[in-house]
Structure formats: C-alpha cells, structure tokens
Amino acid sequence: DGKSPEGNVKFRILSLSLSEGYKIGTLQEMNLSFSPIVSTGGKLTLEGNDGAEKYANMVYVDLSNNSQIQIKRKSWNLGFYCGDEFRVILNSSYATVAVASEKTDFAAVTLEDAQKAPNIAAGAMSEDFSADWIDDVEGDLTKTAFGMIAENAAENVHQVAAQLPGADNKTNTDETENRSLWYKVKVTRNGEGYRVEYGKVGDTTPKTVEIAKNPIYNFVGLSLESGEKVDAQA
C-alpha cells in the first residue's frame, strides 16, 4: 500500500524428524517484530544533473531512510492525482501551460482555435500572461489550470496545452510561434482512474490512454510527446 512495513511475525516449531535424533525443546515459538527504518541523519548528494544538462532530473528524497528517486524532468507533461479526488497538474518544471477551449468534442478543437487562443506560450514575464494558465504556485490542488475532473464526462472540456519558450523551444525555424505544435487534451473519469484523449491541435482523431491511480505515488505522469506514463511523484 506504499507505507513503510510494520508489524510482527510468529514462528512455531510443530515437528522435527525423530529419525534424525532431533527433539523439540521448551522454546517452541519465536516472535519477530519489525518497524520502519528511521534515518539518524547524514548527507545525500541529489542526482539532478546527468552530465548532459544541468537540470535533467526531478529528485524526491525519503528522509526516513536517506534514499532518493530520480525522474527525468521532461518525461511528463501532465500529472494525474492518485488521491481520492480527480485532479490534474501541469509539469511546471517542463514549463507546461494550458487554457480551456470550452469545447467537448475532439475534432471540434482545431488549429484555428489555437490561433485565436491567448498566447499561453508567451512566457510568465509577458504582460499578457495569466495565472489561470498555470497551477497554483503553492501547490493548492483546488487551484489548478484543469480544475476538478467532473463526474459527468460531458462537463469536461478540452484544454489547449503548450510549453513556454525554452522548454524545447516550440517555434518555427524563423523563430516565429508555431501553434500547430500545441496539444489539445480532454480528461474524464474512468472508474477509479482517468481516461485521456489528446493530440496535436490539428489532429482529427485522438490518441487515448487510460491511467490508473497508484496508491504508492501522489501522481502518475503522462508525456503528450511520447504517450508514455511515468510514476511522476513519490
């Protein structure tokens, strides 16, 4: 269940081979108790740099046992909450931003919608940038760009998602903005998990993926670029 093990195991000797000359003594039972390993302190070097780039990994540290987990920073765009609620977060470390399209049909969201949308990829320092395009900077899950994923699938609209300059520089060769590289994404509930349909804004047929909640993690991530899932946050 993702929690540190704690409890006890009882061992009891029921019989021995008399033909071998063994006999059960007065001590027939033994109790083995165990509890989580607690760190007494120390030093830990965070492996955020893989040598190729300075900020390659997101690193999570378990202070109880001096261990760390590295996750490739660019391995996911969206994170799906594994708690009781149905929430989606943006990977701010990969400069992912999103804005609602107000449309529920995949094919209805087109490149024209992206062209008419606010320039969400303008950058946080732009005068036109809106805090509504990113998640709450203090981590409040009730204040995310996607909002709560509604139980009624028809109430969930497509989000137009992009990345800020420098994430992977989503531009044309002449350095002008290329909104055809933006994505459209719709997330609905799928039992106790999620169903995601997504694609480039010009696509007419969506790619779909189902994401199950994993109680060991806070979030399961999805890369819009590769379609791969990743355990995004321990």
What do the PLM-derived regions correspond to, one by one?
Residues 3-234:
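Surface-exposed, beta-sheet-biased, low-hydrophobicity segments with strongly acidic/polar composition
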